[in-house]
């Protein structure tokens, strides 16, 4: 075999290997289309037109309590919710930073519940926020700030190395949404049809410590600084749990 043919065979082999690697990586990654839909929310922002007057950031209390459809129909306000399950304040900071790379809303609404956590809740929740972000230097910073001791950057760069063990857990959902994903939210709002209005609101449980950590205050100040630099109004809220 000539050197030229050997080179062609080698390049073809490399190409096929890369294609198969990317195929199985996409197959093994969770789809979040039929179960744990919260994991698909972050990625939906980049599919939407970037012309929002209001952007919400925070945990489940924003994507379950605020309706962009209602804001538009009743008040003519365009909005999007960049919420995710158990989103930490440093993840909110980097999601805002990521948002400002693409658009400049007039108002940013941040739900302060996450200030009670000064460390990552779990890798699973990290994944539901970080895997959906587009790759950029901001995502790299977000991953570094969020990783638990057991996690590594390579598993975010190449998720195959994190999810390859799912081969025995694959379901029809993994194949059905391998090449396409449906929208599961309305501008980041996740409709929960099983939620019923509360008839009785119980008293809040007392906490052992009501102080927030320095780390949380630092990121809260970072959010404030980003908004001030861009002339954005920052609204802090605590939505019902």
Regions inferred by a protein language model and the residue ranges of each:
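Alpha-helical transmembrane signal-anchor/signal-peptide segments
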Residues: 28-50
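Secreted/periplasmic serine-hydrolase-like ester/acetyl group-modifying domain
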Residues: 125-233
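Alpha-helical scaffolding within the catalytic cores
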Residues: 38-43, 64, 94-97, 217-223
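Structural motif
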Residues: 53-54, 107, 233-235
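Hydrophobic membrane-insertion alpha-helices, especially the h-region
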Residues: 5-27
């Amino acid at each position: 075999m000539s050197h030229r043919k050997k080179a062609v065979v080698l390049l073809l082999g490399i190409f096929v290997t890369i294609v198969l690697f990317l195929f199985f990586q996409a197959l093994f990654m969770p789809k979040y289309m039929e179960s744990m839909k919260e994991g698909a929310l972050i990625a939906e922002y980049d599919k939407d037109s970037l012309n929002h007057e209001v952007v919400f950031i925070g945990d489940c209390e924003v994507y379950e309590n605020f309706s962009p459809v209602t804001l538009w129909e009743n008040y003519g306000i365009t909005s999007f919710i960049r919420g995710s399950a158990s989103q930490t304040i440093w993840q909110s900071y980097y999601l805002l930073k990521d948002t400002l790379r693409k658009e400049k809303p007039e108002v940013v609404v941040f739900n302060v519940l996450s200030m009670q956590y000064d460390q990552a809740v779990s890798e699973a929740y990290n994944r539901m926020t970080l895997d959906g972000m587009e790759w950029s230097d901001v995502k790299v910073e977000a991953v570094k700030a969020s990783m638990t001791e057991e996690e590594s950057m390579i598993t975010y760069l190449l998720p195959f190395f994190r999810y390859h063990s799912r081969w025995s857990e694959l379901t029809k959902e993994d194949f059905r949404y391998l090449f396409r994903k449906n929208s599961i939210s309305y501008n980041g709002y996740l409709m929960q049809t099983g939620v019923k209005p509360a008839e009785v609101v119980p008293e809040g449980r007392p906490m052992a410590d009501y102080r927030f950590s320095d780390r949380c205050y630092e990121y809260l100040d970072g959010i404030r600084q980003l908004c001030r630099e861009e002339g954005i109004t920052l609204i802090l809220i605590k939505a019902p749990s």
